[in-house]
Design a protein with these regions (language model features):
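Hydrophobic anchor residue at the start of the ABC signature
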Residues: 148
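Conserved ABC ATPase "signature" region
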Residues: 52-54, 83, 87-129
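A short, proline-enriched helix->beta-strand linker immediately N-terminal to the Walker B motif
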Residues: 153-157
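Conserved ABC ATPase signature
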Residues: 134-138, 142
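The feature captures the beta-strand-to-loop junction immediately N-terminal to the Walker
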Residues: 21-23
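Helix-to-loop junction immediately C-terminal to a conserved catalytic motif
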Residues: 36
Length: 179
């Protein structure tokens, strides 16, 4: 096969922003997907906090990927889309079942915390009025904010964003960069 990306060496520190800039097709998205573990590099290492994650599943890398296509669940409301990563992370297998989960005492306090985290992110992104809607009822910019929120709510070690602010109004773009 043909090599798409050569000689990439990134060292990013806490609180630092790094932007990959280049023409369409030069490998920016592929680089992000390799870091996230969604694609495998043919050589070299991907390390996070000095630890190689080459053999680490994407779900265990503590990274949040925001795709240009949003990747929202169309059958879920905005609230449910925001809650999904927290439910997967914080609830046990049995607590995730709607009927059975309600019988488990530990589920209630976890769900209260999940709701708080969703509320904080929805306020930050100004999407509270959208929480009961489904993605198909939203504009492109609104969907993008929901996708950002789903990444933010997890509070990951790092965000990998593939053109995350491209569909937003200039004032909201500035607000989110500051956040």
């Amino acid at each position: 096969g043909q090599s798409v990306i050569n000689g990439v060496d990134l060292d990013i520190h806490d609180g630092e922003f790094l932007t990959l800039v280049g023409p369409s097709g030069c490998g920016k998205s592929t680089t992000l997907r390799i870091i996230a573990g969604l694609e495998t590099q043919s050589s070299g290492d991907v390390s996070i906090d000095g630890v190689s994650v080459n053999e680490t599943r994407p779900s265990l890398r503590d990274l949040a990927m925001v795709f240009q296509s949003y990747a929202l669940y169309p059958h879920l409301t905005v609230r449910q889309n925001l809650m999904t990563p927290l439910r997967l992370r914080d609830l046990s297998f049995w607590e995730r079942f709607p009927l059975l989960g309600h019988l488990l005492p530990s589920r209630r306090s976890k769900m209260v915390q999940i709701e708080k985290e969703v509320q904080i992110v929805s306020e930050t992104l100004k999407i509270e009025p959208l929480l009961a809607r489904k993605p198909g009822q939203l504009s492109g910019g609104q969907r993008q904010r929901v996708a950002l929120g789903r990444a933010m709510v997890r509070n990951p070690a790092a965000f990998l964003m593939d053109e995350p602010l491209s569909n937003l109004h200039a004032s909201l773009r500035l607000h989110l960069r500051a956040e």
